[in-house]
């Protein structure tokens, strides 16, 4: 997914801006640090989760080992308390804190992470 694809999907979702933020690779694409991401990962508030869980049929069996709900091949979400959101307020959408992404990538240290580490 390139930046246009990500922004189009976010627009279609039409989630309230203050109830979610864009995670990891997709946030790097929006920032212009990376050209593409495999999918869009979002952290959403418990309040937003309660509003959308029936629409997207979000049941525990749709969670992966990292507690992300798989909605489709392009979108996964994880739920957190708004008070614990680790984000940077940005336009047009809030993004995961860059230092958090960098720390995660340094710890995981896959080949694709090494490329991102140099660019961040």
What are these regions (language model features)?
Residues 1-120:
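Compositionally biased terminal segments of proteins
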């Amino acid at each position: 997914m390139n930046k246009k694809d990500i922004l189009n999907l976010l627009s279609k979702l039409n989630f309230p801006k203050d109830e979610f933020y864009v995670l990891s690779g997709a946030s790097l694409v929006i920032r212009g640090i990376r050209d593409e991401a495999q999918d869009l990962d979002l952290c959403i508030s418990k309040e937003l989760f309660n509003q959308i869980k029936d629409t997207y049929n979000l049941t525990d069996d749709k969670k992966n080992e990292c507690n992300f709900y798989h909605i489709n091949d392009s979108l996964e979400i994880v739920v957190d308390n708004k008070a614990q959101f680790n984000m940077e307020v940005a336009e047009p959408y809030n993004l995961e804190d860059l230092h958090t992404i960098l720390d995660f990538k340094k710890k995981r240290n896959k080949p694709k992470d090494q490329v991102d580490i140099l660019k961040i």
